[in-house]
Amino acid sequence: MGSLSIWHWLIVLLIVALVFGTKKLRNIGSDLGGAVKGFKEGMKDGETPEGQQRDQLSRTNTVDVDAKEKAPHSGDSR
């Protein structure tokens, strides 16, 4: 009564195929495969070597400015 044998799994698979149909199961399989592929690509894009990150940060153009008080507009009546 412990684990299920191969015959139990084959019967379950046959019942699932009869209930859902092979076309529906094929669509579910392809959708699941596409989702896993997209997840793996997303994980690969998120991982960048640390050396590349430093290079990207050092290449940014920085503009040094000093903040001054804002001059009132001539139209302001405050």
Swiss-Prot record:
Compositional bias of kind Basic and acidic residues: 39-57, 65-78
GO molecular function, one term: protein transmembrane transporter activity
Membrane topology designation: Single-pass membrane protein
UniProt entry keywords in alphabetical sequence: Cell inner membrane, Cell membrane, Membrane, Protein transport, Translocation, Transmembrane, Transmembrane helix, Transport
The keyword Repeat is assigned to this record: no
Role, per record: Part of the twin-arginine translocation (Tat) system that transports large folded proteins containing a characteristic twin-arginine motif in their signal peptide across membranes. TatA could form the protein-conducting channel of the Tat system.
Family: Belongs to the TatA/E family.
Source organism of the structure: Paraburkholderia phymatum (strain DSM 17167 / CIP 108236 / LMG 21445 / STM815)
A Gene Ontology term for the protein's cellular component: TAT protein transport complex
UniProt-listed InterPro entries: TatA/B/E, TatA/E
Signal peptide: none
Entry's transmembrane regions: 1-21
This protein's name: Sec-independent protein translocase protein TatA
Location of region: Disordered: 39-78
Assembly and interaction partners: The Tat system comprises two distinct complexes: a TatABC complex, containing multiple copies of TatA, TatB and TatC subunits, and a separate TatA complex, containing only TatA subunits. Substrates initially bind to the TatABC complex, which probably triggers association of the separate TatA complex to form the active translocon.
Main location: membrane
